[in-house]
Amino acid sequence: MTMSLEVFEKLESKVQQAIDTITLLQMEIEELKEKNNTLVQEVQSAQHGREELERENSQLKEQQQGWQDRLQALLGRMEEV
């Protein structure tokens, strides 16, 4: 009888350890999910910022090309004079 009680207590202890481990792992999973969500938001924000910068860069290149064209036209007129 004492032997089976000891075995039961060891089993109970192991079950409790398993429950504790599972609980800790669940908490860690939740933390990792939150971190992942934060990182996803940061990536989306960075992508949005990049898209804005690419649009602005494109506009600036167009403006630069326009100014270069005007300058070439002015230089062409000056050479004619």
From Swiss-Prot:
Residues 5-81 form a coiled coil. Residues 48-59 have a biased composition (Basic and acidic residues). Disulfide bonds: none annotated. Gene3D superfamilies: 1.20.5.340. GO terms for cellular component: cytoplasm; membrane. InterPro entries: Cell_div_ZapB (IPR009252), SNARE (IPR010989). The keyword Nucleus does not apply. The keyword Cytoplasm applies. Residues 43-65 are annotated as: Disordered. GO terms for biological process: division septum assembly; FtsZ-dependent cytokinesis; vesicle-mediated transport. SUPFAM superfamilies: t-snare proteins. Keywords: Cell cycle, Cell division, Coiled coil, Cytoplasm, Septation. It is found in: Cytoplasm. Non-essential, abundant cell division factor that is required for proper Z-ring formation. It is recruited early to the divisome by direct interaction with FtsZ, stimulating Z-ring assembly and thereby promoting cell division earlier in the cell cycle. Its recruitment to the Z-ring requires functional FtsA or ZipA. Belongs to the ZapB family. Homodimer. The ends of the coiled-coil dimer bind to each other, forming polymers. Interacts with FtsZ. This is Cell division protein ZapB.
